């Protein structure tokens, strides 16, 4: 199994990318890594080249580059070359911690969309109070969506939850402003109707945002605009809560003593709420596994993302989506980009 990795994407590239790669190849003897990026900078950190091949390029996509323009103009960028390796059959999947929009564009324009899937979807696994987590999509690949798109998102998320997260018959829910079938706008009402009347996956109805982290669903479906807002809200709320808790525990002698006893528990709580522990965000709907690692990923974050991609390839997630897509076909599908 060969995995193409963009060594130059992310806040801590290439050091943390390279360290994560070395940890992964040491753990999994069945993988080879193709590292795309500046060979000199990569070699500063690559102390073990076992099953690691460097493909040199000076070009990279910056975090502030306009995604589509960058992908079309920077043909030799590390991210683009990694995707091209997948397209050419030289790698089975690709990973980048770089520009999210550029990676989505690369997945669509270079690797290509699955026939029958109208729109791709970005899907991370988010934390729950039980530590189980849930898959949520779309979190930003499409600002707007149609009911048939959300229907397909449910299928893709369900396949991933079953194959990679090992959940038998995953519970798929639709994010809405109420649990009743009649609640919501035109998009959610029509999506509910389509999802209720299919048998490709287990649809359990609407879910409200306040219940997202309560482990009531394994897959939650929404449009990309709403999903991205929810993700940022969860991130912001979590950070604010931990900050307030820290200030309270450090305010006064008694609180500081209590904090010393609670330190281990608080660190475990912080780790439980860190969704990078589940790996990266999958770009579903393209012809091969494409995963966006968190931009601030350290070596362990890259390692968990490689582990995640390895599972996706091994469990044939993309192939399963391709074989199942006709079960959620509504009328004609849009022409592939």
Curated annotation (Swiss-Prot):
Q: Name one GO biological process term.
A: fatty acid biosynthetic process
Gene3D superfamilies xref list: Isopropylmalate Dehydrogenase (3.40.718.10)
Broad class of enzyme this protein falls into: transferase
Q: Entry's InterPro entries?
A: FA_synthesis, Phospholipid_synth_PlsX-like
What are the alphabetically sorted keywords of the record? Cytoplasm, Lipid biosynthesis, Lipid metabolism, Phospholipid biosynthesis, Phospholipid metabolism, Transferase
Pathways involved: Lipid metabolism; phospholipid metabolism
The organism sits in which domain of life? Bacteria
Query: Which PANTHER family does the record cross-reference, listed alphabetically?
Result: FATTY ACID/PHOSPHOLIPID SYNTHESIS PROTEIN PLSX, PHOSPHATE ACYLTRANSFERASE
The protein's name is Phosphate acyltransferase
Q: Which organism is it from?
A: Listeria innocua serovar 6a (strain ATCC BAA-680 / CLIP 11262)
Q: Give the classification, highest ranks.
A: Bacteria, Bacillati, Bacillota, Bacilli, Bacillales
Instruction: Give the gene that encodes this protein.
Output: plsX
């Amino acid at each position: 199994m060969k995995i193409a990795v963009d060594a130059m994407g992310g806040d801590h590239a290439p050091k943390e990318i390279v360290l994560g790669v070395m940890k992964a190849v040491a753990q999994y003897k069945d993988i080879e890594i193709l590292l795309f990026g500046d060979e000199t900078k990569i070699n500063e950190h690559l102390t073990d080249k076992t099953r690691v091949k460097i493909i040199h390029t000076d070009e990279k996509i910056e975090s502030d580059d306009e995604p589509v323009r960058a992908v079309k103009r920077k043909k030799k960028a590390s991210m683009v070359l990694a995707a091209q390796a997948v397209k050419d059959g030289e790698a089975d999947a690709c990973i980048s911690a770089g520009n999210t929009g550029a990676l989505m564009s690369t997945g669509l324009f270079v690797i290509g969309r699955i026939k029958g899937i109208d729109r791709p979807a970005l899907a991370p696994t988010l934390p729950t109070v039980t530590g189980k987590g849930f898959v949520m999509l779309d979190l930003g690949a499409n600002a707007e969506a149609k009911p048939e798109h959300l229907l397909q998102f449910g299928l893709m998320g369900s396949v991933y939850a079953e194959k990679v997260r090992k959940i038998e018959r995953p519970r798929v829910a639709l994010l809405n402003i109420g649990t009743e079938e009649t609640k919501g706008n035109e998009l959610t009402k029509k999506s509910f109707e389509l999802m209720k009347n299919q048998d490709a996956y287990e649809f359990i109805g609407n879910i409200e945002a306040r219940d997202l982290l309560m482990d009531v669903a394994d897959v939650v479906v929404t449009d990309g605009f709403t999903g991205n807002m929810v993700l940022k809200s969860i991130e912001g709320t979590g950070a604010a809560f931990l900050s307030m808790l820290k200030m309270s525990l450090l305010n006064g002698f008694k609180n500081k003593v209590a904090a010393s006893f609670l330190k281990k528990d608080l660190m475990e709580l912080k780790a439980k709420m860190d969704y990078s522990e589940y790996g990266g965000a999958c770009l579903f709907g393209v012809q091969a596994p494409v995963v966006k690692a968190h931009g601030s990923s350290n070596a362990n974050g890259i390692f968990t993302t490689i582990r995640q991609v390895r599972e996706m390839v091994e469990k044939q997630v993309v192939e399963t989506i391709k074989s199942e897509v006709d079960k959620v076909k509504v009328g004609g599908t849009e022409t592939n980009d």
